[in-house]
Amino acid sequence: LVIEMSNRYPSTILNRDPNARRSLIAPRTPCPVLYGIRGESRQDVLDAHEFLQEQGAEKSSGHRAHRTNQATDDHLSSVSSGVVSNTRTMKGGHVEINVGHTLLAFSQGGDVNSLAQKLTPGDQIEWYGLQDLDGNIHLERLRLIVGERNKVRPRCGCGSRFKSQGTNQPLRCPSCGLEHDNLWVTEILSSEWREPSPSYRRHLAKPLSRMGKSEV
């Protein structure tokens, strides 16, 4: 029902986490609020509510539209940038990035954590985040601007990386035995911004889909 609502009223946002396959409009704890619908248009939010009520959702005794600072980045200052000196993957999959001070990409950070694990010394990055009491910055968005990558052997269709068998010999997959031309490939990482999945974002965090949109 929430998927149908999202499709019918596309200006509503953050209704669902497609990765976790769950709705984000209902509270996680017991409370008198049935659901909260966020959107760019007041009228679409009200229409989406009426749609849910007509389609069999639990009946509400009343409703109201509020203007809030959710999904606006109201808690963040300007973007920061720096050069990676080293990284360290900690227990649990959290990643520590040293850029003169410490950036933390938690395992729950999804694409932010995935990019953090691939960073190498010399990479130029940009980020948004909040500083904790220890001075560490908890990353909310991350982007690789420039990064040189070592050449690596290509991957086999089974997922393993081909390995050399010697001079003038084809590469061979150590898992399935498939052979491949003897060559190197360069790993290229996208310079797009990365963000956590909707379930692990702060309420104030602006989704990439809202970047450039006015809050007025």
Residue ranges: model-predicted function:
Residues 1-216:
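OB-fold and OB-like single-stranded nucleic-acid-recognition modules
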